[in-house]
């Protein structure tokens, strides 16, 4: 059977908002960035992790509860938290570039440097950038479940670099739900209006990571991605 397209007329935006896709994604990214900081710190100080402490921050219109790494000697404190308390600076743009094709941004080190400025040395910025990129690539490439009852697509409002924005790129977060309505962030994909290859690349990525069937798909207007799911995934395995 083919995947069915689920339409949510008036309540589509509310339905997607209720999944807290953006909130979950922002939390994941900020915790990953702090983890990258902690790894660079550990390389220099050999101070191992010792659990987490909760921290509440405001970011992109959300109040997020973050897990902040503690270290045994209590010498580590993520500089990201200072930046967020000061308004966040260019952190949202760094988050955006982590999901765009490298050809559109020229690598993430420039944006890591824009975020941390003089808080880290050039050498530390280089290590932090490489660590963050490796962590994000691991997350983007992890294996997925073979079947999702529903896939939900939501356009993100993160600020894009001028070059990417001028080229028409937008970022779409993808949530997969199982039969118990448990949600899992599958990834974030850069797509352009009218470029069929971007939507096809999204589907090929899901297939390469193990997805074999999707029961239903809904979005806030991402027709090309919806149609790609309809064409390439059966409803059941």
Residue ranges and their predicted role:
Residues 1-83:
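Short, conserved DNA-binding cores of transcription-related domains
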Residues 2, 109-114, 193, 207:
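A detector of single, family-specific signature residues
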Residues 8-9, 29, 45, 50-53, ...:
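Electropositive nucleic-acid engagement tracts
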Residues 22, 26, 30, 91, ...:
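Hydrophobic (often cysteine-bearing) scaffold residues that line and stabilize catalytic clefts
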Residues 34, 73, 95, 108, ...:
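Residue-level signature of catalytic and energy-coupling elements of molecular machines
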Residues 65-72, 79-85, 90, 118-119, ...:
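RNase H-like nuclease fold core
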Residues 90-102:
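Short, amphipathic alpha-helical "recognition" segments used to contact nucleic acids or chromatin
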């Amino acid at each position: 059977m083919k995947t069915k397209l689920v339409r949510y007329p008036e309540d589509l935006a509310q339905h997607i908002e209720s999944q807290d896709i953006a909130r979950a994604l922002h939390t994941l990214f900020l915790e990953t960035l702090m983890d990258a900081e902690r790894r660079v710190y550990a390389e220099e100080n050999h101070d191992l992790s010792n659990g987490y402490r909760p921290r509440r921050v405001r970011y992109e219109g959300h109040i997020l509860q973050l897990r902040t790494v503690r270290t045994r000697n209590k010498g580590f404190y993520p500089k990201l938290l200072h930046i967020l308390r000061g308004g966040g600076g260019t952190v949202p743009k760094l988050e955006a570039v982590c999901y765009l094709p490298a050809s559109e941004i020229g690598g993430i080190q420039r944006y890591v440097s824009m975020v941390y400025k003089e808080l880290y040395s050039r050498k530390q910025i280089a290590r932090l950038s490489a660590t963050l990129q490796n962590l994000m690539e691991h997350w983007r490439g992890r294996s997925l479940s073979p079947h999702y009852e529903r896939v939900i697509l939501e356009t993100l409002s993160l600020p894009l670099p001028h070059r990417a924005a001028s080229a028409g790129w937008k970022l779409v977060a993808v949530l997969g739900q199982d039969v118990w309505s448990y949600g899992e962030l599958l990834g974030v994909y850069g797509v352009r209006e009218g470029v069929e290859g971007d939507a096809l690349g999204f589907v090929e990525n899901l297939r390469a990571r193990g997805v074999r069937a999707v029961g239903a798909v809904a979005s806030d207007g991402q027709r090309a991605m919806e149609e790609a799911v309809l064409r390439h995934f059966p409803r059941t395995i």
